[in-house]
């Protein structure tokens, strides 16, 4: 009888545990709620002397900064097709807006209560100050600069026609912390938070020994008037180039390819080594969204371009998403770290026309994920989701060593002194 009771009881217990897990433990989103982004930045009133909080209004005087902002991923953080598709996949959960449209003025609802920290149980009510047009500005000027009717910035002296105040935090990485240090939540076992760029950067080489901050690379210094008819002074460009910009990623990494044989002959087994260096980023590469990764590809092609042999390695994060979030491993590159990838090939009797192609690609997401977002979640547009960071071809003949020497001569300084390839020093690539 006891045995039958156990048999009958076991499914009930399993059902109860499963129900408890999915209703009380399993996260609805892939991150935890930190207090400073559990809610939107409180409603901001228009500072005296201005007619609007909108970026275009700021651009009447700060024209160059406004034009830069318009080209940035910050300006597109809300209507970006990838965000919109992922957000639809996540059932348009409100909490994503706290970084993609951070101001209360930009959000359709107000969050009054978050019972037990469960975002799907949040008590919401209509926001009387919601401006849908302003929402589309995403990470706009006021997100960083306006609080309580005052415009904050990095300068102590100002002759602006509106209230201003100096904030020393603008000379640190602190303004980036709120949205670029997304942390883990319950039943989430990451090595670093899901979008933990700030945590990767904090305390590392570039800040400790070089004094770099996020803005050193992502908001390069420039000498110009901050506003129309104002004096020349050193400020920063408002570009925020990152993983969506091929030139920025190319600037962060250095690549070398070498062969272990100076003069290979038919029948020889030649080993090629591609060294990938995080030579210019103060955080891991790749960083940001956990879907991002690099591929390192070797292929041997014949005269007609047919692939004879190939090998692909991947660098990124591998995460188990169900039933709990568990990061299985993370093989991304720390600042100034390098990794070698090897490929061996035995030269055939006829090598004429054969060539080795070495390529490094950066991927925002996989082909499978991209297809899913298109077919199921309305991803639109033709924005690239992968691009080539490095690609070279080498003839598989006795000339290979000379070809590789020419290639690697370009990168000698980088390999000897990788810390000098920072974006601050290497601003033009």
Feature locations, PLM:
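Sequence context of c-type cytochrome heme-c attachment sites
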Residues: 11-171, 175-178, 184-208
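Acidic/polar hotspots within intrinsically disordered regions
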Residues: 426-428
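Eukaryote-biased RCC1-like beta-propeller repeat architecture
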Residues: 3, 119-120, 298
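Short, conserved sequence motifs used for protein processing/export or organelle targeting and
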Residues: 210-216, 220-415, 423
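N-terminal Sec-pathway targeting helices
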Residues: 1-13
């Amino acid at each position: 009888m006891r045995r039958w009771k156990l048999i009958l009881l076991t499914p009930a217990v399993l059902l109860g545990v499963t129900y408890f897990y999915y209703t009380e433990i399993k996260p609805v989103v892939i991150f935890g709620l930190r207090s400073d982004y559990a809610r939107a930045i409180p409603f901001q009133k228009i500072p005296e002397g201005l007619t609007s909080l909108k970026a275009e209004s700021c651009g009447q005087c700060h024209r160059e900064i406004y034009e830069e902002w318009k080209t940035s991923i910050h300006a597109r953080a809300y209507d970006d097709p990838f965000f919109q598709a992922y957000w639809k996949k996540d059932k348009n959960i409100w909490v994503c807006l706290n970084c993609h449209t951070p101001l209360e003025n930009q959000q359709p609802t107000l969050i009054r209560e978050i019972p037990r920290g469960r975002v799907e149980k949040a008590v919401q009510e209509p926001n009387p100050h919601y401006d849908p047009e302003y929402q589309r500005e995403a990470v706009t000027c006021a997100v960083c600069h306006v609080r309580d009717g005052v415009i904050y910035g990095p300068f102590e002296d100002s002759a602006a026609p509106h209230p201003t105040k100096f904030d020393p935090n603008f000379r640190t990485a602190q303004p980036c912390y709120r949205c670029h240090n997304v942390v883990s939540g319950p039943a989430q076992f990451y090595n670093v938070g899901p979008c933990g760029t700030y945590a990767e950067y904090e305390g590392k080489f570039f800040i400790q020994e070089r004094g770099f901050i996020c803005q050193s690379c992502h908001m390069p210094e420039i000498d110009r008037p901050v506003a129309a008819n104002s004096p020349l002074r050193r400020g920063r460009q408002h570009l925020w180039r990152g993983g969506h910009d091929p030139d920025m990623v190319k600037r962060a990494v250095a690549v070398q390819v070498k062969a272990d044989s100076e003069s290979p002959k038919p029948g020889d087994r030649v080993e090629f080594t591609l060294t990938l260096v995080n030579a210019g980023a103060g955080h891991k590469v790749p960083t940001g969204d956990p879907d991002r990764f690099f591929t390192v590809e070797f292929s041997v092609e014949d005269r007609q371009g047919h692939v004879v042999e190939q090998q692909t390695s991947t660098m990124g994060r591998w995460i188990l998403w169900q039933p709990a979030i568990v990061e299985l491993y993370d093989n991304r590159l720390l600042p100034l770290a390098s990794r070698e990838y090897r490929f061996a090939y035995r030269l055939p009797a006829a090598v004429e026309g054969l060539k080795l192609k070495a390529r490094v690609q950066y991927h925002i997401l996989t082909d499978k994920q991209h297809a899913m977002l298109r077919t199921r979640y309305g991803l639109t547009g033709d924005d690239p989701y992968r691009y080539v960071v490095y690609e070279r071809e080498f003839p598989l003949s006795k000339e290979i060593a000379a070809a590789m020497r020419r290639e690697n001569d370009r990168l000698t300084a980088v390999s000897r002194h990788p810390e000098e390839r920072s974006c601050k020093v290497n601003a033009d690539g």
